[in-house]
Each structure stands twice: as structure tokens, then as C-alpha cells.
Amino acid sequence: MSSLRRPEHVVRSIPDALSGARPAISFEFFPPKDDAGEALLWETIRRLEKTQPTFVSVTYGAGGTSRDRTIRVTDRIARETTMTPMAHLTCVGHSVTELRNIIGHYANGAVRNILALRGDPQGGLDQPWVSHPEGLDHAEQLVSLVRQLGPFTVGVAAFPDRHPESPSLDADAEVLVRKADAGAAFAITQFFFTTDAYLRLRDRVVARGRELPIIPGLMPVTNVRQLARMTELSGQPVPKDVSDRLEAVDGDPAAVREVGVQIATELAQSLLAEGAPGIHFITMNRSPATLQVWDNLGLEAAQWGAAAAVPDPVRS
């Protein structure tokens, strides 16, 4: 493992930031598939960097299909920005040896935060989960492996509206507690639309003796077509009041975007008022809606040492 001193933004503690007075704001990106996507991603990264987020994360494609691109983007964020990167890593499609190699790459580089996930079934969400014959079955096993192999902070996923394969909300809470017992320091939720869903999950975890920080995942809806995809991904229907507000302005893209931003702002305000440690924005590699919600919340850019020299954010 390299003994070189790493920049402050790389080794910054996410759990420490979650316990601070300022809400922890973070952004999620996905690795692009082509040059045009790469250009859009880095335009978005540079715009969002100016808010000085607590951390940013880079997703991992289904079945590990984006492994090399995830590693490349995460490494570049660590090298070329002032932001703290977190790499997503999934069990699906990987042997333990392959997982060790990926984790070892990060341990020898500049990434100190990993979001450990089981991952979606290969072939789609409607397919049964089948583990790699030499791999892992559960996210808590991956949490343990990551913790064994380097000085990592490990986050995990949480599901306020119930995981598609889970029999109950209680079962979801029990799985989350097992992940915490394995060494997870915090959780990020799947996107959802009601504060009550978040509070139910948080209360169930606390009732089981855990004070695990749970960051709400929030995705501003910018077009009505997203609603069907969100239902597919979460396994839960979008609440009728949300779909009604968006469908009422369908056909007017600007109005749909404005309503989507307002819905996201209202939810974020409610969650923060209820004590959520922050908001994790699922950006879809685009900045305008995310920046507008950030602006609506009246947040100020953090002052992280050398990062304080970054100019004020460009509002959109």
C-alpha cells in the first residue's frame, strides 16, 4: 500500500461530516459510455464542485459492466477535483478474487470510500438473483471484505419503500442492521417520495439498537417518462399526488422540470427538518435541476480547507 500523503479531500471522513451542523450534501454520477457522455459528465462535475459537496459517488453498471469506467472516473475525481470520491462496488458478476483486485486498486490509490452493494440480478430486475460461483451472496459480506483490505469507510444501500425482493419493511431494517454490524458507517437510500417512508426506516433501525446515519437519496424528476422507470427500479408505484402534479403539466417540458424541482425541494426540506443528516442527489449526470434544489434549500458551499478557494456556484 502506498505510504504517500494524500490530499485532505481524499481522506476526509464522511461519517464525521454527517454528524456536523451543516447538512451533508452529496451527488451521484454514473460512468459515461462515450465521449459525448464524458464531456457532459465533466461539465456537470465542474458545476457541482462549486457547491463543495461532502462527497460524490460513481455508480457501478449492472453485472459489473462499467467496472473499468467506474474506476477511471472515481480515480480522476480524486486526482483532478477538490471533491471526496466514493466508488460503488457490487457483488454481482464478480469472484472474490476479482473483488479483492478492485478493492486493492483503490487501497493503493486515492479512494478511501466505497459503497458496498449486492447489485441487481444479471439480466434485469425481473430475474432471480444468482451469485457468482466464487463470489459473495450479500452486501454485508462485501462490507466485511472491504474493511479487511484497506483503511476504507464503507457505505451501504437502504430501502425506505421496501426492497423488491424483501418480504417486509421489518426485514429491510434487519438487513440494514446486519450491514452495520459488518462495519458499514452509513447508508444511502434508494430514491423515494414521502418523508414518512424515510422515518419508518430510521425508526425501525433505531428500535434495533443502531444509530446508523441514513442519507436520503433524492432524484428530481425532470420529465414524465421518468415516472415509469422509477417505478420499475424501486418496485413501488410513484405516489398519486406526485404523478398527478407532474402529469398536469405534461407537454410543457419547462413546467414539468419546475414542478419536479419543487417536489424535490419540498421533500428535501421536510427530511432535513426531521433530522436527516443530509441529501444525496441522484443527478443523472446533469446539474441544472440539482443546483436549483440546492439553491432553493438556501445552502451555502462548505469550506473544506484548500477547497474554500473554489468560486461560488453557478446557479441554474
Q: Language model features by range: what are they?
A:
Residues 7-8, 14-15, 36-39, 64-76, ...:
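Active-site-adjacent beta->alpha loops and helix N-cap segments on the catalytic face
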Residues 20-24, 52-55, 81-85, 110-112, ...:
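Short, well-ordered coil/turn segments that N-cap beta-strands
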Residues 6-11, 133-159, 208-266, 297-316:
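Active-site pocket-lining/capping segments in soluble small-molecule metabolic enzymes
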Residues 29-32, 59-63, 88-94, 117-120, ...:
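Active-site beta-loop-alpha junctions enriched in small/polar residues
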Residues 28, 56, 106, 179, ...:
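Conserved, mostly hydrophobic/aromatic
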Residues 24-42, 85-97, 153-171, 247-262:
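Active-site mouth loops of central-metabolism enzymes
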Residues 144-188, 262-277:
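Active-site/ligand-binding-proximal alpha/beta "capping" segment
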Residues 2-58:
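Conserved N-terminal beta1-alpha1 strand-loop-helix module at the mouth
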